[in-house]
């Protein structure tokens, strides 16, 4: 028993030596945080955890004008560094407010070059579907789907509220996407869950030959009551599942864990709502 307790104590010591809570200073306000792990561009072979989020600095309204980033080496999650504002957009004399963002890495199979796509969720008029790209996870980032005057997104830009992007690398040489090396999908919505496959040539529009899943997960505006049209078919549900159990509200976030795909989102408050 003593040996077991000592082992547990040592494990706890190791955990506290490499992590802390709260992990960011109390003066920082970074909601909508999306965690990602990328190779450190300044230390090849080393990896960092990146937190990308909106920035609550407006006080009287949600979020602020910048996408904020903090990062830490994966081997020591107590050493967080402020990477600063990694993206803002100024047009017509004012800054766009930025809501919940996402950031993904795409690696070219032939050259090995990495490109980072930022989905900043601008709330600027006609700029909500804005997508940016850069050569480093901490930027700088340049919009790739805006008109020349920076006021509007170009045709085909349809991504909406709280986007989450999933990049799936292709390893099967028989797969038609093997030469490209990946496929990408986007999930988004506010009280209405939508998903579709991205065109890998643009990373902001629908891939030709595919369709939009306009009702991906059942949404609610009251707990347990589906607000989608009666008879809606959901591609993300098994036949036995009850649509009233999902209560999608906003904040899509998807990951692959082992051989399973895990969809996380903010649900409409109810008896099973909680934070942990």
Regions found by a protein language model. Give the residues of each.
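Carbohydrate-active catalytic/glycan-binding domains of CAZyme proteins
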Residues: 19-276
